Each structure stands twice: as structure tokens, then as C-alpha cells.
Amino acid sequence: MDIDLLSNIFFAMVRTGTPLLLVALGEMVCEKSGVLNLGQEGMMLFGAVTGFIVAFSTGNLWLGVMLAMAAGMLLSMLFAAVALGFNANQVATGLALTIFGVGLSTFVGAAWVGKPLTGFEPVVIPLLSDIPLIGRMLFAQDLLIYLSFVLFALVAWVMLKTRIGLIVQAVGENPDAASAMGLPVLRVRTLAVLFGGAMAGLAGAYLSLAYTPMWAENMTAGRGWIALALVVFASWRVFRVLLGAYLFGLASIIHLVAQGVGLSIPSNLLAMLPYLATIVVLVLLSRDPIKTRLFAPVSLGKPWQPGH
């Protein structure tokens, strides 16, 4: 396998892993606050269709990105109102949100299926993009991928080095103690949910405005569910989220790698690998639930109200 082929593989790995990275970062912050939102797939799809329609209608890709994030936040507000405001079951609410988001995106985007759009183009950084092996992977990507690098660094810094990160984690570990210390538990959790919605909307916008600049029904292809498994796989650790996202991205393009090295394996079989990998990860984690619980936020998925 020559260096040019490896460079192309790493380049494609980052492209395919970026939507997983974005949505998983948002979900990780949400879960760190103690809230389990299973509505990622629906929010991604609604963000994707909103971003595409806005960008197609106005010719402004960045306006599409911003309104895609707003669309994801809108659905996450609905989740927060039901799950946090009315203390509803978070799992059931998240599943309902996914069903609602999938149906809403299909309805809204029915007239826009297959329409062409000039999306974000790669921005090549001179000299740096010529670095062997990693040059194209890091310095010849589109602006949304560069934005994902910045957002990853920002989330890592906030969660690991700032008081805000400590507050989010305190709320997720022991909301009663956090409340007794004067921390606004419900407000922190609501903001974490909204951040997760914005990141899911951004991931959807990346799919419809950069990765494959078009709108197609169910174009997320289960990435929201994979991201949920990815957060558990990463043990709620931000750097492992980055690694896991790109590993799943690599699994998504393994059929192209096989073609590049001349392996005659059916492409449909290889295309199943990301989903098989998700199942394998969940099975392996379920074999050691005690270890998984050690890393999970203690109050994850548990309803909480002041004074209860």
C-alpha cells in the first residue's frame, strides 16, 4: 500500500468521521450533565433538510449552517421541555423525538429531494497540505471540517479545564449536591441539551452541504444511533470520542480501501461494517456493565426535580 493511497484513506476517514464527531461531542456534553437524549438521528435529519433548503433558496451556505443548528436546537428545546420540564422518561422522549424528526424532515424535504447544490469546497492550505501522509487529511479539507477541529478543541478545553466543565459534570454526577451548592441544575441540563441539539443540527448540515451537497430522505443513515454508541464506547471521554469517530469513519470507507488494494470482497458486505462494529461494541460493553457504569455519569437518564 503506497503513501498516496494511505493519504487518500486518511483524507476520506476524516470526511466520513466528521458528522459522527460533531453529533457525538454534543451528546457527550448532554450525557455528562445527566441527560440521555436518543433523538440525535431526528435532530440531524431536521438540521440537514433545514440547512439544505435555506442554502439552496438563499445561495448562502453559512446561513444554511446557522439555521440548521437552530433547527437542531428547536427540536432539543422540545425534548428539554418534555423530559426536564415535565420530568418525562428520557428514553421514551428521545425515541419519540427521533420518530418526529425523521417524519418532519421527510415531509418538509419532499419537494427538495435530488436538487443539486454547490456545497462547501475543500480549502487547501499551501505547504502544509503537502506534508506526506497527513497533509491532505488535516490541511486540504472544507471549512466545516476545520470548524469541527476547532469545536473539538473548544469542547475538550471547556470540559477538562474550566469551571463550566466542572459544573456540567457535577450536575451529572450528583444533582442534589449540586443544587445544595447553589448550582442551577435544570438550567445547566437545559443548556447542555440545547448544545447537543445545535451540534446534531451542524452534523446534519455537514452531510447536506459538504459531504454530499444534496437532500435525500434518511441521508443520515443511522449516524445518530452510531454516535450514541460511540459516546459509550469512548467512556464519556472527549479524546476517545475523537478517536472513535474517525475509527467508525474508517470502517465506513473500508470497501473503498478494499478496492484500492485489489480485494474482491462484495462492497455491500463491507458497507455493513460500521453497523456491525456498533453492535460488536455494544455487546462487548454489555459483558462488563460494572466497568461501563464506573465511567458513566451517575445520574445519567434519571429524572430530577428541585426538592425531590
Predicted regions and their residues:
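Transmembrane alpha-helical segments in multi-pass inner-membrane proteins
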Residues: 211-275
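Loop-to-transmembrane alpha-helix initiation sites
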Residues: 90-92, 118-124, 141-147, 189, ...
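Alpha-helical transmembrane segments within multi-pass membrane transporters and channels
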Residues: 59-104, 247, 252
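Hydrophobic core segments of alpha-helical transmembrane domains in multi-pass membrane transport
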Residues: 23-24, 48-52, 102-106, 147-157, ...
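Helix-loop-helix "hairpin" substructures at the membrane interface of multi-pass membrane proteins
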Residues: 137-215, 238-243
